[in-house]
Amino acid sequence: MSIDRLLKAQKQENLEIVTAILDDGSKPDAEYTIEHHFSSTNFDRLEKAAVDAFKAGFEVNDAEEMELEDGSVIFCFDAIAHHKLEVEMLDKACEALLVLAAKQKVDYDGWGTFFIDEDGNEYIDDDEYVDDDEEFEEKPVH
């Protein structure tokens, strides 16, 4: 699929996700942690994408190895940004990251964030509060 088609689909998904999160009552003016997901079967390509994302101003976490259901292995990392949950900002970031992914021949797998209540607390799901002082397995809303 061309970058233009991918971007058009991603922009539609951005709008749907932001609308759903805010309609569920997530705090509209909070600063969100946005995790943009990348993956590849080629570690070297993924590493180059991580360097490019870092140079573009994103925080980048360490690459992880994951085994898929079919037994194959992929590598993945997140490029992380912190900002309000605004569709326009997400659209710009997604466009830049889709171009980066195409350049490095890796997959951009969308983004995720957490629900934030009126008190500014992040939630993994409806009843699991994220305590920054405790370790937890992250499970973004999307």
Swiss-Prot record:
<dbReference type="GO" id="GO:0005737">
    <property type="term" value="C:cytoplasm"/>
</dbReference>
<comment type="function">
    <text>Globally modulates RNA abundance by binding to RNase E (Rne) and regulating its endonucleolytic activity. Can modulate Rne action in a substrate-dependent manner by altering the composition of the degradosome.</text>
</comment>
<protein>
    <recommendedName>
        <fullName>Regulator of ribonuclease activity B</fullName>
    </recommendedName>
</protein>
<keyword id="KW-0963">Cytoplasm</keyword>
<comment type="subunit">
    <text>Interacts with the C-terminal region of Rne.</text>
</comment>
<dbReference type="Pfam" id="PF06877">
    <property type="entry name" value="RraB"/>
</dbReference>
<comment type="similarity">
    <text>Belongs to the RraB family.</text>
</comment>
<dbReference type="InterPro" id="IPR036701">
    <property type="entry name" value="RraB-like_sf"/>
</dbReference>
<dbReference type="GO" id="GO:0019899">
    <property type="term" value="F:enzyme binding"/>
</dbReference>
<dbReference type="InterPro" id="IPR016716">
    <property type="entry name" value="RraB"/>
</dbReference>
<dbReference type="InterPro" id="IPR009671">
    <property type="entry name" value="RraB_dom"/>
</dbReference>
<dbReference type="GO" id="GO:0060698">
    <property type="term" value="F:endoribonuclease inhibitor activity"/>
</dbReference>
